[in-house]
Amino acid sequence: MERASAPLVTGVGQHRYRALALVLLVACGPRVEVSLPPADAPATAVAIAGAAVLIGTGDIASCTSTGDEATAQLVDSVLKADSAAGVENHVFTLGDNVYPRGSARDFERCFTPSWGDPTRRIMKWIRPSPGNHEHDTDWAAPYYRYFGARAGEPGKGYYSYKAGEWHVVVLNSVLAVSPRVPAADRRAQEDWLRRDLAEHPTRCTVAYWHHPRFSSGTHGGVIRMEPIWRILHDAGVDLVFAGHDHHYERFLPQGPNATLDTLRGVTQFLVGTGGGTLRGLRRPYARNSAARVQGHFGVLKVTLGSGEYQHAFLDVTGRVWDRGRGRCH
């Protein structure tokens, strides 16, 4: 694939911000509707001492697109800058890592030249999750072979790890949504999740997977993810990342039935902008949808501090379309 020009990434948290309260671009260009910082907002994010960084996206590599090459360059640039500053980094993927079917050939021809490029830092810190496209080939066997132990136990794909002071949970949403999955396997993941959360009673927790519980995109929210969301909500989990729909969207904290919950609700980020064909939004927008960006490849960078976090959605030029901060429950 052809290499895009290098994105603007000048250092830890030093990215351009658009000083507008609301942007709505239509007509010829990509449509963007997102709440942005006020005009007097600082031009750089405030660093969180001792924080770890999660950066990634979903719906990534395709041999018919150069979007994955651009997002790979962006992620690698951030990793390089953060590493120079001694920041702990982890790269997440939100499923559909490679198109069209997640075969070994797809990984070799389409993923390796961009996100899997050994000259980049991505594979050193990658923590993937599987999507439905990986399961189109031998029930994701090539995915597990490609990523090895970093993908969790073959056939399961769920695992957890530590990032700074945060607990991070990775789930296989295909086990929750596919009618091909035996009920026993679905329950096994749910039981594992309950045990894992009980064994790691940290104040701050983030979980990620492929199919979103809530979405204003063409696929829409996936009701079969409600049991997982309920477990997370009951345990006081703070953040969820998902993909599947090919746009960016941030939601207000909510319960499993889209009830606004500012005290214990889970905040979902949908980031399906890694390189697969971008898609639009549907009206009316999903309840509690707070920010939406369509028509831009990009990644989510979340800085995980002690009891707090900062988030920023960057497109492949380094421009930040949505940013903010929050505190853990």
What are these regions (language model features)?
Residues 173, 208-212, 244-245, 314:
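Short, well-ordered beta-to-alpha junction loops that form the rim of enzyme active sites
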Residues 26-27:
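C-terminal motif of bacterial Sec signal peptides marking the signal peptidase cleavage site
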Residues 73-76, 99-205, 220-239, 247-301, ...:
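Extended active-site neighborhood of metal-dependent phosphoesterases/phosphodiesterases
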Residues 312-321:
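Short, solvent-exposed aromatic-acidic interface loops
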Residues 16-22:
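Sec-dependent signal peptide recognition
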Residues 58-59, 95-96, 131, 209, ...:
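Active-site flanking residues adjacent to catalytic metal/cofactor-binding acidic residues
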Residues 32-106, 187, 195, 215-216:
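N-terminal active-site segment of His-dependent metallophosphoesterases
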Residues 1-15:
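N-terminal secretory signal peptides that target proteins for export/translocation
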